[in-house]
Amino acid sequence: MKTIYTLLIALIFTLNVNAQTETKVTSNGQNITVTIQNIKNDKGSVLLGLHTEDTFMKGPGIKNLKSKIENGQVTVTFTNVEAGNYAIMVMHDENDNNRMDFENGMPLESYGMSNNPMSYGPPQYQDAKFEVNDKDLSFNIRF
């Protein structure tokens, strides 16, 4: 029984040390500031998702933000973003239902992505991808 308690204490200590190490690493990440200026009205909110290739167009991002619109514009910041490749997707959720609305397969609400690609089909990760290194980044995304 003493052996089991000793192993449990050692395991908890190990997990605690790992958790502290991970927190320390993520607190050294970069900030990504996103500005959207051409929002057609102040109804609803803007939803923003920071995505990896694995999450892009498959659900929520690895970091997600929601912002109220003031005077047709929004500025938000993703904080503590670790180095790597990402893409940002944004949408104007006019009816605040937290999802994109469609009619006949076409989006009813405005949307945009990092790098502002002009595409005639579903958004592609490669078109919106950017790299985070050792500097903060800023993006102006258009709907």
Task: List PLM regions with ranges.
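A glycine-anchored, Pro-Gly-centered beta-turn/N-cap motif
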Residues: G72, T77, E82-N85
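Short amphipathic beta-strand segments in non-cytosolic proteins
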Residues: G49-L65
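Acidic, glycine-anchored loop motifs typical of Ca2+
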Residues: E94-D101
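A short tyrosine-centered beta-strand micro-motif
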Residues: Y86-V90
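Short proline/glycine- and polar residue-rich coil/turn motifs
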Residues: S67-G72, E131-N133
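Short loop/turn positions at the edges of beta-strands in beta-sheet-rich folds
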Residues: K40, N80-E82, E94
